[in-house]
Structure formats: C-alpha cells, structure tokens
Amino acid sequence: AMALREMGYETIMVNCNPETVSTDYDTSDKLYFEPVCLEDVLQIYHKEKPAGVIVQFGGQTPLNIARALSDEGVKILGTSIDSIDIAEDRDLFRKMMDQLGIPMPESGMATNIDEALACVKQIGGYPVMIRPSFVLGGRGMEVIYDENMLREYVAKAVGVTPDRPLLIDRFLHNALECEADALSDGEHVYIPSVMEHVELAGVHSGDSACIIPPVTITKENLATIKDYTRKIAEALHVCGLMNMQYAIEDGKVFVLEANPRASRTVPLPQASTERAT
C-alpha cells in the first residue's frame, strides 16, 4: 500500500483483523474493516471502482476467492488467475512439475477407504502422510503406518467429498525442509535467499524457525533449489511474489508446494539481505 501511494495511487485496504500493521490508519488511504470474503469484497469493489485488486498480500484467504472475483468482472492485478489455479490445484501443479522434470513426493487423493488403499499401493506403501484438502495450518494431518490406522482415519474423516478429498503423500524420512521466496516481473526472477528450517520436514512451517543463510544445505542443493524456483516462477508467469517450499531427502530436492503470494517469510530475506522484496 505504501509503495502504491508513493507511485501516486489511492490505496484501499480490506482487513478485519485490527491487530495487524496493515490496519494502521496511516498505511492506506482507505481502510475497510470487513471480512475478506466474496460478498463483502464485491460490495467494496463496486462502491470504490478501483483500477484492480491485488490478492497476493493477504495470505491464503484472498487466493481462495480470486477466481470468484474474476468471474464477477473484478480485475486481478499481478499473477494471472489461471496461474493461481495451477499452483493451487495439486493435479495441475503436478502435471506442470512433470513437464519441467522437477520431482515431487508421490501422492494421490481419495474420498473413501477403497480409493485410499489403492492410493497407498500406488505410492509404494506405508508410511504415508494423510490430511484433509480443505484445511490450513496442518490441521488433521497424520502419519499412517499401516492399513488399520488408515481405515480408522478415513472412518473418522468428516466432510470428505469429491471436491474435498483426502490428500495422501509419500512420507519423507528424516527430510530437511527449506523455503525460497521469489520476486518476478513476469520475465526476470529474483531469489534473495533460501531459508533452512530448524525442525525436520513435517512440522508446520508456521510453527518452525528458519535460518538465513542455510547452514547444512549443500551448495549443490542450494543451486538446485534456486534453479527449480526460477523455472517454476517462469512457467507460472508469476508477476509479483511467490513462496516455494522444498524438502531434501538423502540429498535429493523435492518440491512440496508453490504459493503464488507473499508468505509470512517475506520480512526475513528483506531484513537479512537488506534488500526489500
């Protein structure tokens, strides 16, 4: 908001959390204390008639309504809706990784026990990581070591539908997790740093600590991470910020996910490299 104001734009902030810095009275020209949901954002959009809406700086919530906003005629600035959809859809993103030759842990989706058993067999057996597809923050995630545990988990799962399946991934043993933030104008990609997690992969990144610069990641793995990040940003035609999450198992780098938005890690490389991302 401050950068846009310096460029001469009037800025409008939508945020219902009064504890955040973005709701300070001097951050934006106008501030709406409203839920970041389709109905409320549309009402503000029709009233203010802005040049466009930026969905990259509000965490996951704005991305969840980006497609619906676009369908209602809202102009989304930055990374395109189609690219956001690819990054958010596990099947589409995996197909892109296959095309780029970038490895991901074997995974699948299931809506019932038969599909779950078939998925585990396809992945290569136990242990597997299973979680609902419609929650954030690692809620409902569990490591499954045998068929009995799988049957018990699926039986207790609530709200599972074809649109909200269970996600099943191969469990990575003693894997190191790391992240990379990237900034792109659609052509050039800038990667300020790679962040190494203190905890092993599997601890939710919001509950873990990061180190900049990395301590135990090899130069070869660092080069691979930056190469993968650049290729993915270019393939998605990212215009703005992107956060990449990786896991390293036995010296091999696996992509976990791409977030086409600013992550909570953005201030870390900015502070450590003394360059604003």
Where are these regions (language model features)?
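Glycine-rich phosphate-binding loop
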Residues: F57
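A conserved helix-loop-beta module that forms one wall/lid of the active-site cleft
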Residues: T79-M141
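N-terminal Rossmann-like NAD(P) cofactor-binding module of classical short-chain dehydrogenase/reductase
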Residues: I54
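ATP-dependent carboxylate activation and anion-phosphoryl transfer catalytic cores
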Residues: A1-P50, Q60-L63, G78, L100, ...
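Catalytic-core regions of core metabolic enzymes
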Residues: L31, D71, D82-S83, E115, ...
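A short helix-to-beta-strand connector/capping loop
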Residues: T27-S28, E72, I102-P105
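Short Gly/Thr/Asp-enriched flexible loops that form oxyanion-binding sites at enzyme active sites
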Residues: Q60-G73
